[in-house]
């Protein structure tokens, strides 16, 4: 399905929250769609439509401004996402951000995924798959990634109980690999972690759909108080979009 045209008012609205150069780590944008009751899915592992096609175009526009798109293993197993960018710039160029999959224990069979097909068809880049240094990836996945110029990135993710420390390790390594900006899209555990770590997140962009998903839904909420500054709102055909920075 082709994207709707980008609503013109979104460009100036988003501008100050898009990546700018950072000296020693990637610029990190946390962005996701949620219901009015702060749920991102109706049930664990269930793909749930929340946002309008208008803000789907916005998501691809934001992707076009980043070097990488990060999701966790839960999102990958539930949604089998394509993680490419389909927004076409005015000059006809389509950006190719690098998919980044956080999969510490090596659960994902990449060679069977939609993303593998996307890369085979030259419609996106092969992923960097972040695994713990003790994990041995599947031979099939290694072979496919080698051909597509993707990679398994081994990091000490499981031995470190300090989640902030883990994120610093991840961001430092990705910066060394040439990823200067990252759009983090989920899932819930990653979102909930990062909402607490204000020094890691540079911009927060939340799409809010006019729906309640109920108490059985997958909730996103920080474990403690998290304040926002530089807050701006945008109202679309159906959805509201919040842009802000964490204090």
Swiss-Prot record:
UniProt catalytic activity: 2,5-diamino-6-(1-D-ribitylamino)pyrimidin-4(3H)-one 5'-phosphate + NADP(+) = 2,5-diamino-6-(1-D-ribosylamino)pyrimidin-4(3H)-one 5'-phosphate + NADPH + H(+); 2,5-diamino-6-(1-D-ribitylamino)pyrimidin-4(3H)-one 5'-phosphate + NAD(+) = 2,5-diamino-6-(1-D-ribosylamino)pyrimidin-4(3H)-one 5'-phosphate + NADH + H(+)
Keywords, comma-separated and alphabetical: NADP, Oxidoreductase, Riboflavin biosynthesis
Enzyme class: oxidoreductase
EC numbers on record: 1.1.1.302
Pathway of action: Cofactor biosynthesis; riboflavin biosynthesis
Annotated NADP(+) binding sites: 75, 79, 165, 187-191
Function per UniProt: Catalyzes an early step in riboflavin biosynthesis, the NADPH-dependent reduction of the ribose side chain of 2,5-diamino-6-ribosylamino-4(3H)-pyrimidinone 5'-phosphate, yielding 2,5-diamino-6-ribitylamino-4(3H)-pyrimidinone 5'-phosphate.
NCBIfam families to which the protein is assigned, alphabetical: ribD_Cterm (TIGR00227)
Family: Belongs to the HTP reductase family.
Name of the protein: 2,5-diamino-6-ribosylamino-4(3H)-pyrimidinone 5'-phosphate reductase
Organism: Debaryomyces hansenii (strain ATCC 36239 / CBS 767 / BCRC 21394 / JCM 1990 / NBRC 0083 / IGC 2968) (Yeast)
């Amino acid at each position: 399905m082709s994207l709707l045209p980008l609503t013109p008012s979104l460009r100036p609205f988003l501008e100050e929250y898009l990546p700018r150069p950072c000296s020693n780590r990637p610029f990190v944008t946390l962005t996701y769609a949620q219901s009015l009751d702060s749920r991102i899915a109706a049930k664990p592992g269930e793909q749930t439509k929340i946002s309008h096609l208008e803000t789907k175009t916005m998501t691809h526009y934001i992707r076009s401004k980043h070097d990488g798109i990060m999701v966790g293993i839960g999102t990958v197993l539930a949604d089998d996402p394509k993680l490419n960018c389909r927004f076409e710039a005015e000059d006809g160029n389509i950006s190719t951000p690098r998919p980044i999959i956080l999969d510490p224990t090596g659960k994902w069979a990449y060679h069977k995924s939609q993303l593998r097909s996307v890369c085979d068809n030259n419609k996106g880049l092969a992923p960097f798959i972040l695994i713990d240094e003790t994990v041995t990836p599947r031979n099939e996945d290694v072979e496919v990634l080698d051909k597509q110029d993707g990679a398994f990135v081994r990091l000490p993710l499981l031995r470190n109980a300090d989640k902030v420390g883990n994120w610093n390790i991840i961001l430092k390594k990705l910066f060394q690999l040439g990823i200067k900006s990252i759009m983090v899209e989920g899932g819930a555990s990653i979102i909930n972690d990062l909402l607490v770590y204000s020094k890691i997140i540079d911009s927060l962009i939340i799409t809010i759909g006019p729906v309640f998903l109920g108490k059985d839904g997958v909730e996103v909420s920080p474990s403690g108080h998290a304040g926002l500054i530089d807050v701006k709102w945008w109202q679309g055909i159906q959805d509201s979009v919040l842009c802000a920075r964490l204090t």
